[in-house]
Amino acid sequence: MDIDYTVGEVELSYKPKFKSLHQVTCSEDAYKYLLPTYKEGTICYKEYFKVLFLNQAKQVLGYTLISEGGITETCADVRVILQAALLTNSVAIILAHNHPSGNLKPSRQDMEITKQVKNAAQLMRITVLDHLILTDTGYYSFSDEGEL
């Protein structure tokens, strides 16, 4: 019996739409980049987990939506986050998700996913600079609060 040893080719690509010349130097900068990624009326509707990708100079390469959840939670896969970071040649990332309730306090699950991503990213020499919890009126920064 003959075996067909043909395999499919995997193509990976990243097509930047713009070149940001601005550095993300603090959590407020990250918030200002991330807030406009929410369509009007959606930040209070349900949870979305997003990642902001940065180069060596901490300039924004882009962002991606990792997951879309319900009113009280969303599930983020560490592998999907790191896959996107590797595809964009990111040196650093900023995790972000919103709390539709407006409560800025991180949950136990928020703390756990932050730890998991940070530990996995370290193996790839990618730095998790922050994890922001966003609302329409403000944000919570894991980095600013010493939780990273």
Locate the predicted segments by residue.
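Active-site-proximal loop/helix of nucleotide/amide-processing enzymes and allied scaffolds
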Residues: 1-16, 32, 55, 72-148
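Glycine-rich, small/polar surface segments that engage phosphate groups of diverse ligands
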Residues: 18-80, 84
